[in-house]
Amino acid sequence: MSFLLLTPPPCLLIPPPPLSHRRSSSLFLKHPFQPSPRPLSFCKPSALRLRANTTVNSLKALETIKPYLQSESKTVLLGWLCSCVSVVSLSQIVPRLGSFTSNLNANAASLTKLKGECLVLAGLVLAKVVAYYLQQAFLWEAALNTVYKIRVFAYRRVLERELEFFEGGNGISSGDIAYRITAEASEVADTIYALLNTVVPSAIQISVMTAHMIVASPALTLVSAMVIPSVALLIAYLGDRLRKISRKAQIASAQLSTYLNEVLPAILFVKANNAEISESVRFQRFARADLDERFKKKKMKSLIPQIVQVMYLGSLSIFCVGAVILAGSSLSSSAIVSFVASLAFLIDPVQDLGKAYNELKQGEPAIERLFDLTSLESKVIERPEAIQLEKVAGEVELCDISFKYDENMLPVLDGLNLHIKAGETVALVGPSGGGKTTLIKLLLRLYEPSSGSIIIDKIDIKDIKLESLRKHVGLVSQDTTLFSGTIADNIGYRDLTTGIDMKRVELAAKTANADEFIRNLPEGYNTGVGPRGSSLSGGQKQRLAIARALYQKSSILILDEATSALDSLSELLVREALERVMQDHTVIVIAHRLETVMMAQRVFLVERGKLKELNRSSLLSTHKDSLTSAGLVI
């Protein structure tokens, strides 16, 4: 019980949702086309998972679960209490079976007593059935609530990671993360339930049934005990094999999930390139690898319980010995019946222990991979003394900023200095890969600069709370991100869980030139946008993105190629919205379109990590041709 008395992590304060659990099943079908399941170069296991310690043993796996199970101790105790009731009922059934058989040939005077025994037996059986049902219900509740807390905490830690974790080659793909938090978390729930429902209840039942067997015949009990050690050693060996096979199976499933998460969102690109057949072949490679590894796991999982069946062979020898003892001793037939019944009820919990060990070894890799997510630490760390900004004027200073994505790479930014006054609009132009977007990521503190500092209103951004910094710096990118939901949900995204202010939503939409088209939609602001905003045009999505940035009342706005992919009319509407926004915001514009660049008061060229100011008036004459030929403006 001591393992339940640990301090829970902060995530455990989150109330659990209504319970639901559904076991997944596997269907193994042969397919006439079975290509070699060679791993593809872009989808190596090393790119899909953390470099976790593969020698995690069972005790360590259990240790990681303890804090999350602590708040479920009351539910677990109720389940184990029901288990005690079930075992006590069963222990009362065993001796009554012996007396019941001895009374079968009794005279008529004993029939009344026999009827009474039948009623008692029926009552005990009913009590056992009800208690066992409640035991399972309570323990499933504890297991599912525990995994819910682990899921919430793991996902929170993923969201807290810096951008490098998702963009670098050593992180985890989104498909792998989704697989861990869904499918593998369900396997962890199965493992926790198997342990809770087996270890203590089976130990109680084994103890009670063994006591009955000893009372009936110590000699027969000794013969029974001789079977157990050899079987236990074999189960331990096979369990270790199962853990290794299970890990390979989970990696194969994660690869398949990652592949689907990459290809399905790009279905337009696939069809445009007539790649349906090639993608089908690639899918079959991953699916075949997943099938093969799962099949190995299922075969090993099926083998271990069968080993426990060897104990039944041992019981045959016990019956033979029992017959000899009965023939040459005073052991009654009722005692033999009690012993055999106790042995039958003993074999089930011993077999359940084997199955629980089976579940533990199968679940260990899932526990390890899920808890890899909870152990993630962000490289962008908020200082304890960081302050909350109530109001921001919008002055931005970049002081000797240098940055490179990897120690072995050349600097993307090299000693860059820039001072932007509050309310000023600055445009950044330059070739792709020159460092423009990197500069924006540093301003949002998605990365830490290699050297130098970024100052907002005379305060180093490292001294500002991350939530406060990103509240006052709004981003509108070329690739607009919209989530399934209504237009109001997407504009008021920041307040989605706390309550959206519809007046602010409508005001932001009007400023962003979006109110008119929104009101022409069937349900206005309550119109669904579809997956990733699929029901809206590019211009409409871009205006919603501007409205979203305005809704959060950001003093500093970053426009990263906000008009590059729009048609002329949409671009005109977006530019009109931007002109209104620029009147009372500090705006940093990254653009290639000359019309958008000329909206800025100052223009800078970012090239090879350096910053050079361009004469704004000469952009229309002297520098225009050279910038256009270099592809810096269009």
From Swiss-Prot:
It comes from Arabidopsis thaliana. This is ABC transporter B family member 29, chloroplastic. It is found in: Plastid, Chloroplast membrane. Residues 1-51 form a transit peptide. Belongs to the ABC transporter superfamily. ABCB family. Multidrug resistance exporter (TC 3.A.1.201) subfamily. It is a multi-pass membrane protein. Keywords: ATP-binding, Chloroplast, Membrane, Nucleotide-binding, Plastid, Transit peptide, Transmembrane, Transmembrane helix, Transport. The gene is ABCB29. GO terms for cellular component: chloroplast; chloroplast envelope; chloroplast membrane; plasma membrane. PANTHER family: ABC TRANSPORTER B FAMILY MEMBER 29, CHLOROPLASTIC, ATP-BINDING CASSETTE SUB-FAMILY B. The chain crosses the membrane at residues 75-95, 119-139, 195-215, 219-239, 307-327, 330-350. Residues 77-362 form the ABC transmembrane type-1 domain. SMART domains: AAA (SM00382). ATP binds at G430, P431, S432, G433, G434, G435, K436, T437.
